Design a protein with these regions (language model features):
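Gly/Thr-rich phosphate-binding beta-strand-loop-beta motif of the actin/hexokinase/Hsp70
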Residues: 2-21
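Nucleic-acid-processing active sites and adjacent nucleic-acid-binding tracks
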Residues: 23-63
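Acidic, metal-coordinating catalytic cores used for nucleic-acid/nucleotide bond scission
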Residues: 65-75
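Long, charge-rich intrinsically disordered scaffolds of nucleic-acid metabolism proteins
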Residues: 92-211
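Short, solvent-exposed helix-loop connector elements
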Residues: 126-140, 170, 263-266, 295-312
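Phosphate-backbone recognition surface of nucleic-acid-processing proteins
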Residues: 215, 221, 227-303, 307
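Conserved small/polar residues in nucleotide/adenosyl-binding loops
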Residues: 334-341
Length: 345
């Protein structure tokens, strides 16, 4: 059982930390607060400070906890993991909505809230584990490619908008430069695709699962890469399609309370919108070119389902098929009814 809880509030330049010593649900001793730079030197100072204020506890009884803030939190998380310490990186929304009424808002107070969250919710701890090197590289290139696509769209829209306005030397200059930039972006996107293929090809486990995912008509490179990255090659959610669907934001949930609240099931806005949009594109393609998915979609429409509801069912179906095939290490997806376990997904 953990006895020492260290809550860390991450920011770009510093780390605010609060220590709570507890035995069961009883807090022992006074809370300690410290502030450290968010770099390797600061990480060492943080650990030395914790050791100084550890009250005779051992490292196995410590639990570091912080909010998932991306680049601000990943450095310390990896450093502590490498040193053998337990660190829990939790969703910021979960911490905020479990802290009760708060009147004070500053970094010191936030670190105390995080430490208290780790103490009160220690039975729900999910220890931090970094992505392996291949997945980490895949994630960076995938996100970089996504940014490039956004920039290309913005550039094309601006170019099209200017082309429709009055002709002038300035407009000609903008169009000429826009064409050049769009061509360069397209070239870089193609290089990103090659890099993604190269990383997957070099990792046997990624290569195997990637081949399984892309064997499904409608699911291509970007959706397969996205699913591998955000599910940690399906290990993050324990091969549970319902959990993955929740993360994608396609799992429906209803609301019921007493006699006045009875809302039909619908998808939640708590989702990763990037990967949800990619899955939506896959579903659109699958319902056109994948015979089994097309029949499934038409069957739902014939039963009176609205097109968007039927399309969301297709998204869920794709996730369930992918997870089942990966879990069973099927060589490829050829026909839904060829696999009895998939027929009722």
């Amino acid at each position: 059982m953990k006895k020492l809880f260290i809550g860390i509030d991450f920011s770009k330049e510093k780390l605010d930390a609060t220590i709570i010593l507890a035995c069961g649900m009883n807090e022992i001793g006074s809370r300690e607060y410290g502030c450290f730079p968010n770099n390797t030197t600061g990480y060492r100072k943080l650990c030395n400070w914790v050791k100084t204020n550890a009250w005779n506890t051992i490292a196995e009884e410590w639990l570091f906890c912080g909010e998932d803030t991306g680049s601000c939190s990943i450095g310390l998380s990896k450093w502590l993991y490498g040193k053998g310490y337990d660190i829990w990186i939790e969703n910021a929304y979960a911490i905020k909505h479990s802290s009760g009424i708060q009147r004070v808002k500053n970094d010191k107070a936030d670190s105390a809230i995080i430490a208290e969250y780790a103490w009160r919710q220690q039975d729900k701890v999910v220890p931090f584990e970094p992505l392996n090197e291949s997945l980490a590289q895949l994630r960076e290139i995938f996100l970089y490619r996504h940014k490039l696509v956004g920039q290309r769209v913005a550039m094309e829209l601006r170019k099209e908008d200017k082309s429709q306005s009055n002709k002038s030397k300035a407009i000609s200059f903008i169009n000429r430069k826009s064409k050049h930039l769009i061509a360069e972006i397209n070239k870089t996107i193609a290089e990103c695709d090659k890099a993604i293929d190269s990383i997957i090809e070099a990792d046997e486990e990624l290569k195997e699962n990637y081949a399984i995912i892309t064997s499904i008509k409608g699911v291509a490179r970007q959706n397969a890469t996205c699913m591998l990255v955000y599910t940690n090659n399906f290990k993050k959610f324990g091969y549970d399609p319902r959990k993955i669907a929740c993360y994608y934001g396609v799992a429906p949930f209803g609301k019921q309370s007493g006699t006045s609240v009875n809302t039909p099931a619908h998808t939640s806005h708590f989702a990763n919108k990037l990967i949800k949009s990619l899955l939506g594109q896959a579903a659109h393609i699958a319902k056109i070119y994948n015979p089994e998915i097309r029949d499934y979609y038409q069957r739902l429409i014939s039963k009176g389902k609205k097109p968007q509801v039927a399309l969301n069912n297709v998204k869920n179906k794709l996730i369930r098929i992918i997870v089942a095939l990966v879990r069973k290490k099927a060589v490829s997806y050829t026909h839904l009814r060829a696999h009895e376990t998939l027929a009722n997904l």
